[in-house]
Amino acid sequence: MDPYKFRPSSSFDSPFWTTNSGAPVWNNNSSLTVGARGPILLEDYHLVEKLANFDRERIPERVVHARGASAKGFFEVTHDISQLTCADFLRAPGVQTPLIVRFSTVIHERGSPETLRDPRGFAVKFYTREGNFDLVGNNFPVFFIRDGMKFPDMVHALKPNPKSHIQENWRILDFFSHHPESLHMFTFLFDDIGVPQDYRHMDGSGVHTYTLINKAGKSHYVKFHWKPTCGVKSLLEDEAIRVGGANHSHATQDLYDSIAAGNYPEWKLFIQIMDPLHEDRFDFDPLDVTKTWPEDIFPLQPMGRMVLNKNIDNFFAENEQLAFCPSLIVPGIYYSDDKLLQTRIFSYSDTQRHRLGPNYLQLPANAPKCAHHNNHHEGFMNFMHRDEEVNYFPSRYDPVRHAEKHPIPSTVLSGKREKCIIGKENNFKQPGERYRSFSADRQERFINRWIDALSDPRVTHEIRSIWISYWSQADKSLGQKIASRLNVRPSI
């Protein structure tokens, strides 16, 4: 089946106006009325159709990552990693794969300024010969929480107050005061890189630990990292106010204009590699999404590059309807037992079905570019042309068969059912190390941002004391400086 064979396209536009059903429209300016000044007639089908379509133009916006911009391009393998994975699109240097990327802010609504202090989404959809691979990450290599059970609460806390619809620091600091694992993420968010200059000048990260499997079935844990060839650039507070005040869509425009001018953005893709047999050797859990892997132990190894060389043709079709799901993987790449990744496997596809409908993977931006076949059919907005008589499996009348078997991780797991926190939390070491890596003026700006947040009049003495305690455990001098400026005694 060819999913594009019967697809409506502007390439087939008629030279004159029509209704959705193709009937010619001889007047698209005036309603049908009784006389020149009389009431409008309900029988004016063209008017009814036009208004009904307009009333339904908007779809539910993403609950997070609503504000975003997309572009198309290709991924090219530059270094051989076939010893690590049997993924076809990574089979050899020089292999190119078409892709589409969506950059985004996270918390605020569609149309909000792109200069707010907020993580940035960095999602890549690879259209491989073995199906789509979605690498759905952020510009920071860590996250606020490690268990998806807390994701709805976290988003609620970061979103505007449900009563006033204003994002307020006291709500954020209250929630995360219960989650010291968030400190590492805050050393990125409240750092100078918390407001990227634009989408072209920011890092990307797969954030989670993934698994690569080679033809022999050997598995390795990996972390994915995107590095822009033009470097990382950010906006300080005054710059963000100036840029955002002049153009609330500055990052979207910068991306579009750069590609249109032939100044194609490029990122190098690196991986960190760990043998799963060694995962217990460290003072952190390699599957803990609030931790980074030290680069002196796990150096960044180059594997490819991404070039964005084509703007999207239509914002709604290729940005609003573009749907990413961490569940979409290909042979040779697998998940890990990262608790947050495990919940995203379900949650993302579930929210796309709500937002776009059960057949969202038939939409052109989401459909695979390779031949594909299954019996998932019908449902709302199904436009796949099908003429089979057999819609079940197996059948002696239909030659379709199982695909060739590919290796998956063979780890043997055992344990009792339990709800608990991981053993190696170690919430303070890496945040402290990152803070101490800042220059003195960068540390000062970091402290000032925390002073500003903790000075919210609705932040209680108890919450301030908790945060000072947390930062003191990360770095004693940091906690003392915050406590001194807030006139609060550290609890440790």
Curated annotation (Swiss-Prot):
The active site is at H65, N138. It comes from Gossypium hirsutum. This is Catalase isozyme 2. Coiled coil: none annotated. InterPro entries: Catalase, Catalase_AS, Catalase_clade1/3, Catalase_core, Catalase_haem_BS, Catalase_immune_responsive, Catalase_sf. It is found in: Peroxisome. GO terms for cellular component: cytoplasm; glyoxysome; nucleus. Its EC number is 1.11.1.6. It catalyses: 2 H2O2 = O2 + 2 H2O. Keywords: Heme, Hydrogen peroxide, Iron, Metal-binding, Oxidoreductase, Peroxidase, Peroxisome. Its cofactor is heme. GO terms for biological process: hydrogen peroxide catabolic process; response to hydrogen peroxide; seed germination.
